[in-house]
Amino acid sequence: KGGLLVFAAGAALLVARGLFASPLVGVRLDGAGTLRFGVNAAIVAGAVALIAFVWSLLAVPRDLEARAYYELAFWGGGHVLQFAWTLLLLVAWLLLADASGVRVPISPRVVALLFGIQLLAVFATTLVYLAYDVTSVEHHRLQTWLMRIGGALAIPVIAAAVALGLARRVRGGPVPAQARPLLAALVVSL
């Protein structure tokens, strides 16, 4: 139990720092602004995940068998946390692509829209928590559905765009020595 509290405190401090120190997206939605939006969306997802964890821990009956207790206690928050990780992964792909000279054939607005859909799914989690008990089948099904719809939409689109840009970059001639490690990291992360 103590380890979970230390982990939760660390996560809460990280999210709080992110919320108070996150860079502004800006008025003009260019590539950098879109990436800032993605990072900010991940921070918000982390905050909602922490709220979901606390809510679930308070709502799940303590007299359940240990496996059932922990599954119910961490189901909703865990799904929301996956949104944060996915957003950060997508931002990392786009950053690595840019840093290694890969031109990704997708507009910043489309990427921002995909990030926004994930953020809407994160906010929909609060509706699931308000509408259904944490121990209900509906709660679990809707959390899974949110991951399938909101979470899975951006991954193939951005991965395909990065892969296409990567293929074009590799065919375009030799890669500068300083970009090779970044390009390798991008390739193995896809």
Name every feature range the model reports, one short phrase each.
Residues K1-L190:
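Hydrophobic alpha-helical transmembrane segments of multi-pass integral membrane proteins
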